[in-house]
Structure formats: C-alpha cells, structure tokens
C-alpha cells in the first residue's frame, strides 16, 4: 500500500466542493472563469481520489464480511473471492493518485516554440531536419494542434538548415518538452552508389512560449538592429531594411528574423527571445533544485544524443530510457505516442523516487 498524503487529498476534496458550490450559486460572477479553470484542473485528481475512497470502503466492507462468523457462508466465500480484485484496483488507483499529486511543471500547459537545426552530416543532415519537422507536423495534426512557421532556411538539396515554428494547442509543451536534444539518423543516402550507411544529426530545441508575465525584458537590456534581408545566394530580396536582429545584452542571446515585414520580424524576434530567456531561467532553476539527483529525461541537455533513427533496420531507439521500437516508418509519420508516453512515465517515476528520498 502506498502512503499517500491524506491531508493533501482532503484539502483538494474540500476545495473542489467549495468551487462547485460557488460556481452553482454565482454563475455570472467576475470570478466564474477563474473558478471554472481551477475546477477543470482539479477534476482528474479529485475523481481518482473519490474512486480510491470508494474502493477502500468496498475493501473494508468485504474484509469485515469475510471475518464475521455470523455472516452467511456463501456471502463470506463471495467476499474472499472479490477482495483480491478490489485490492488490485486500489493499488492501481493509489499509483494514479500519487502521480496526479506530483508537483506540476508550470510550463506544461503552454504552447511551444520548436527549433530544428541541421548538425553534422552535410546535405543529409538538412534532409533529416526536414524529415523531423514533417514528423512533428503530423504528430501535431493528430493531436489537433496548430503549427505556424516562424522562419526557415532551406537546404541546398531540400530539407532545412534551420526551421523555427510555433506549436499551439492543449498540453503542447507537456508532450514535446522531452524532444530537446540531438537526434541521429543512420541511412543510405540516395546519392550513395556504394550503399554505405551514413550517419548525420539534427538538433531539436523545444521552448515553452513565454508571456510578458513570465519574463521581464527591459528596453535598456536589448539592442535592436535592422538590415537588409537576403535571399538565396545572398541577393537582397527587397530594398528596405526589413530584417531585424535583437540582442539581449546581459546574456548575449541574439535572435534574427528576416521575413519581408519589419514589424512582424520584430514581434517574432521578441517572441523567440522571450522564450529563450524563460527557458534559460527554467534550466537554471531545475539545475539548482535537483543538482544532487537530476532526472535523466528532464535534464533537457541540448547537446545530449537522445535518439537514433536507423532506417536499414527500421528501428528507433531512445537512449535515455533504453527503448527501441521497430516501427520507424510509423514514427516518421508522426506516431510518437508510445515514445512520448514512455518518456513522461519515466520522468514521473524519477520524480516519485526523488520525493521518496526527501526527509
């Protein structure tokens, strides 16, 4: 039996009942939207706590029936038969509640900025960067999310040297945050006459989209430069200084946007800068919080090789959790749920172990 914090569970039940009452009595109040949001957040955990409470009561009744000598023999036999099944259900519910009570990542409900950059491997790396972007596009479509292109630098033979997009929808960052790192591909390029397998890589960064309230950027901390946007081969695509480069002086972080609209470039560059600064703060806080024992998956180290896509063998391997799937074709079509769910589960297990080590 898992030792769950009963006081915390009772507080959540009490708070949920209070919200239900306030929403029913004041449907037109100014606080209704806020209450409805909190109600929605608590629904899952409160539902599981109530299920667990009912199951425990059922187990107690069955145990009492089994141990009561005055109970009809047939009823006692029935209790003996049913009790183990109820106890199994309790064990599952306790695990569910424990996970739902874990500290929430404040960024989990945010949208994300997805950045993919070709790494080692030349032309093959740019093609792979394009393959990864299409994989995430299809995954997003399956989830009902919206993907909007921010900027793209195309490769000479297709794919991308770099591509940045925003991904918007429910729970985007919670699902994509473990995709950050180096993705490696092993396959035979179409131009390889000898059939040799080449290895190349692309780097993925997933940043939670930050709002003004999340991160403060002071005007005196940024320098904004404008320049002419260049097209393929370096030719100027227009005669106005539409490209924008924003430098965050304290950190040295630089963001460049070079589309046709200077106003749009400035807004996009600030959006990406804000996300990178917010991500930097999150990484620093995570490092300080669990320096002694960092979650293997949660580190988000951009230089860490996290996954290998082996085309000749039709397999994909996530090195952080030693998971290998022989369905590479489906993964490249956006079927990422098995990988994503395994990573989330591993992270939750690490958090539970971390909490268990606390005095």
From Swiss-Prot:
It is found in: Cytoplasm. Residues 283-309 are annotated as: Disordered. InterPro entries: PCRF, Pep_chain_release_fac_I, Pep_chain_release_fac_I_sf, Prokaryotic/Mito_RF, RF-1. Its main location: cytoplasm. It holds the Pfam family RF-1. One of its GO terms (molecular function) is translation release factor activity, codon specific. Keywords: Cytoplasm, Methylation, Protein biosynthesis. Belongs to the prokaryotic/mitochondrial release factor family. NCBIfam families: prfA, PRK00591.1. This is Peptide chain release factor 1.
């Amino acid at each position: 039996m898992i030792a769950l914090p009963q006081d915390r569970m009772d507080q959540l039940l009490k708070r949920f009942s209070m919200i239900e009452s306030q929403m029913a009595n004041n449907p037109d109040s100014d606080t209704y939207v806020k209450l409805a949001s909190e109600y929605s957040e608590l629904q899952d955990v409160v539902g599981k706590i109530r299920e667990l409470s009912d199951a425990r009561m059922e187990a107690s009744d069955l145990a009492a029936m089994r141990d009561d000598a005055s109970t009809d023999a047939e009823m006692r036999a029935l209790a003996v038969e049913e009790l183990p099944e109820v106890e199994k259900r309790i064990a599952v519910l306790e695990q569910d509640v424990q996970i739902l009570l874990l500290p929430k990542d404040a960024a989990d409900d945010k949208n994300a900025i997805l950045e993919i950059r070709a790494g080692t491997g030349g032309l093959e790396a740019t093609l792979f960067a394009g393959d990864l972007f299409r994989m995430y596009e299809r995954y997003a479509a399956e989830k009902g999310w919206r993907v909007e292109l921010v900027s793209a630098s195309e490769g000479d033979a297709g794919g991308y040297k770099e591509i940045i997009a925003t991904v918007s929808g429910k729970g985007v960052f919670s699902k994509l945050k473990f995709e950050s790192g180096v993705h490696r591909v092993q396959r035979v390029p179409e131009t390889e006459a000898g059939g040799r397998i080449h290895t190349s890589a692309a780097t993925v960064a997933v940043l939670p989209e930050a709002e003004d309230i999340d991160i403060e950027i002071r005007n005196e901390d940024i320098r904004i430069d404008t320049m002419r946007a260049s097209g393929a081969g370096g030719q100027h695509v227009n005669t106005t200084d539409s490209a924008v480069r924003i430098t965050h002086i304290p950190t040295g972080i630089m963001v460049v946007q070079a589309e046709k609209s200077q106003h749009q470039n400035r807004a996009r560059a600030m959006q990406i800068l804000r996300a990178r600064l917010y991500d930097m703060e999150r990484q620093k806080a995570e490092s300080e919080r669990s320096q002694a024992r960092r979650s293997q998956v949660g580190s988000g180290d951009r230089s860490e090789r996290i996954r290998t896509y082996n085309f000749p063998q039709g397999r994909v391997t996530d090195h952080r959790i030693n998971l290998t799937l022989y369905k590479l074709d489906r993964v490249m079509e956006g079927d990422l749920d098995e990988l994503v769910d395994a990573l989330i589960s591993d992270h939750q297990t690490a958090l539970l172990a971390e909490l268990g080590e606390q005095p």
